[in-house]
Structures are given as C-alpha cells and as structure tokens.
Amino acid sequence: MRAITDEHLQAYLEGGCLQKLFNVIDEDPELSFELRVKGEVMIYYHKDKIMTIRFCKGKPSVEILFEKYYKKATPPSVSFMYDDLMETLRHTDQLRKYFKEAKRLIGSYKAGLEFEVQQNITLGNRSFNNRFVVVDMEWQLPQSDIKVEERISRTRIDLVVVDTKKNDMGENDIYLGELKVGTGATGGKSGIIDHVIKTNEFISNAKACAALRKDVESIIRQKAVLGLFEGDYTGLNLSDKPRMMLILVYRGSEERQVLEVQEEIAKDKARELKMAEPLLVWHNALITLEV
C-alpha cells in the first residue's frame, strides 16, 4: 500500500526534521511529491525520479538521483550522505541548490514537454472543489506478491484521477489517465490500441483494482494532511473498478485533427473489448497573448 508511517508523516510537518525539505519541494511547481510502497516518498521532475526519501527508526535517509544522469557530468555538489544529512536538511539554500543542479542534469539527459503538461494538469487539479482531482502521477501497480504468470504488463499510469461528481451508482469514479501530447506521442494505430488493451487488462484484474482503490484512499488522506490538496474529501465513495481517461493535448488544428482519429480508434477498441468508453479530455496547449 502507498502510505508512510505517522512518524514519517510528522517529520514533514512543523518542527519536523524534513519540514524544510518538504517546503522546498512544495514551493517548486516543477517537482512532484508522491507516496510509494515500503514507506518511501519519491520526488519526480520531468517524469524522472530526482530523490527518494525514507524514514526508519526515527531517522531519515535521502537517496539522490541515479548515477546515469551524471555519468558523463559532475554530480550534484550537495551531500545527503549519512554524516552530512542532518546538517544539509537544516539549510534551505543547500536544498534548493541540490534540486537546481539535479534538474540541470536531468534536463541534459532528457527533456520532456509531456511532463510539463502532466505537471500543470496536476497543479491545476488539486482541489476537491473542482470536478477532477489528480491524486497521483506515475502510479505503478506493485506486483511482487503476484504470480509471474498472472502479472500485468506495463502498469505505470500517467495520472490517477478522482471524479468528485458521483456517477449513477452514487460512487466517485477513479480514472486511469493516459496523456498524449501532440502527434509525436500517439505511436500510430497500434500505440493507442495498446493503451486501451493495457487499461482493460488492469480493469479486469480484481487484485489490481483493489490495490489501486486502497492506494487512492491512503494517498488522499495523507496528502490532505500535508496540505497538498484543498477542499473537503470526506464525502467520497470511491468506485471499486476504475475507468480509462484519455487526455489529448494539441497545438493547433492540424494536431487536433490527427488526435481526433486517435480518439475514434480508442473508442472502437473499447467497444470491441466491451469496456466502458474512455472519457476524453481535450486541452489546447497553445498560449494566446491577451491584454
């Protein structure tokens, strides 16, 4: 289950040893704070893990970004090694310096328009006063306790979204959000079909659905305590079976026309599999200047 211990949670709050680190992460719209299994917290930047935080027996530990990002460059200068950790955590300027250096390394290694859109969608949907709330980014089904022959392939989900408007059954739907930015992300007919098949495989697996629902409940509760969500979530009645959401982001009419073809392909495949039609969300990424 995606949850951290109460002791770990308190460390991010007022007076906790991780409070300054949390504040630096929370104030930066390019960083995403996500709860993971085994009591870990992972911080993402451009879809890449920039930091992992653990807390055990009253003491924190911090793992920086993977060596692959600086194999041919200079690693971040800020130390999170055991002997230096508590001192580093006391200095906001050092924490900001780490993320600045780490971002630069990731940016050199991998750029991503898709993440920028994904992050902005997350930031714009953090309130339960809105129709939709993004609960988690890059969620992945833990399968270590599932037999190899029963495991589901490619279970990483771009966005886990909760609908605050109840459906006809009086439940709040959980959506597995798949993000497509521009025509370069569609991967042709097979790409969109693969995503529908993957989602249907997940939805048809009772263990996967139960694990997702349990995680969503836990994540909402703990992120609310940390102030990462706004509004009242106590009236939610989460559905047991998630649905698919397809978020199509276009830049101009030509990209929209191409993505409209992808929309029909997705709907046709869903009908063939006898699954609920994906909820389509359109977003124009072009910015029109106005005064």
What are these regions (language model features)?
Residues 1-291:
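Charged, terminal alpha-helix-loop-beta segments
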